[in-house]
Amino acid sequence: MSVETIKAESHGLRSAVSIELQEPTPHFSDDVWQILKFHGIYQQHDRDVRGRNNRVYSFMVRSKLPGGRLTAQQYLIQDALADQFGQGDLRFTTRQGIQLHGVIKGNLQTTMKSLNDVLVTTLGACGDVSRNVMSCPAPYGDAVRTQLQETAEALA
């Protein structure tokens, strides 16, 4: 089935995500995996054990930060999640996003809720979408930078 067909039949990009989150498997089905991208999540497996009988799955969660801005609280929660549920580091992208690698399936809901609680979104951070609207996040107080940041946030 094509990605476009999967999206069209996904009930607003919900698909069976909530059902498969409750299943004890360490990964998602191929159809749900395609939908997860639009929620800012990539399913991955450890390449060092590729080809063996059992794949070791983990997930990358990418935050979408319009204009590259985030509060101290938003950064600190991502840093804490990296230590608690990830591989202990964060990766900053050229599109002004933050990637949290190494999250296992059983910790995805808590990770996503923690991000959402501090108003960090992952929606549209991955997949075949416009991933972010970038602008200079420097905290200068001139009118032009303020207008650019407001426009980036509105467009994102």
Go through the PLM ranges and name each one.
Residues 2, 29-31, 107, 146:
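Serine/threonine-rich low-complexity intrinsically disordered regions
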Residues 58-156:
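Small-residue-enriched alpha-helical segments and adjacent helix-cap loops
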Residues 11, 17-26, 30-69, 131-139:
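Short glycine-/aliphatic-rich beta-strand segments at the starts of folded cytosolic domains
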Residues 1-17:
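Intrinsically disordered, low-structural-confidence terminal and linker regions
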